[in-house]
Amino acid sequence: MNIQRKKRHYWLRGLGLSLLLIGSLQLWCAWQVYRFSQPKNDLPQADAAVVLGAAAWGNRPSPVFRERINHALTLYQMGYVRKLIFTGGTPKSGYETEAEVARNFALKQGIPEQDILIEMRSKNTYQNLVNTRFLMQKHHLRDIVIISDPLHIARAMAIAEDLDIKANYSPTPTSRYHNASWQTQAAFFIQESYALFIYHLLHFGRSISKIII
């Protein structure tokens, strides 16, 4: 009977510790999302600005995507970066990729074609940055500035760090989420905090499996 009690005691302690660790990680992820979303007083310099993909409406960038592109153009025009990298594939064949839509938008704003790089195969943030790393190596770019919506930055920076990409960040100063209702803002904050939490869990799992194997 004592053995059974001890087993249950250790099991409950293990469960309690696991829940504590999971809760702590969730709180830490929420803090990271909040911290990285805050406006930056200084604009970072780098070899290139990377615009993470977002929805394209036909051959036009969605409002969210357009704000990301415009912020990258501002950094380029002010001399903070010398190259622009646009990322993103397409959900359906026969449509322009997100990267192509962004490139065409930038060309219409007078950006020289030789200063634009694109990758057109990615479907998510992780693939955006994996393919960006390849472009950096191919074109001898040392560092980048990641551009996305404020609440998306924390996850993008975590991925960049895991991929050994030397990166800074610059959240878009304007976004549809800034003018959204508090319910919409809260929902997006929770969504991004959860996405970052899941990413760290999966990354930890992959790291453990490599050690075991």
Name what the model sees in each region.
Residues 1-47, 209, 213:
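N-terminal membrane-anchoring alpha-helices
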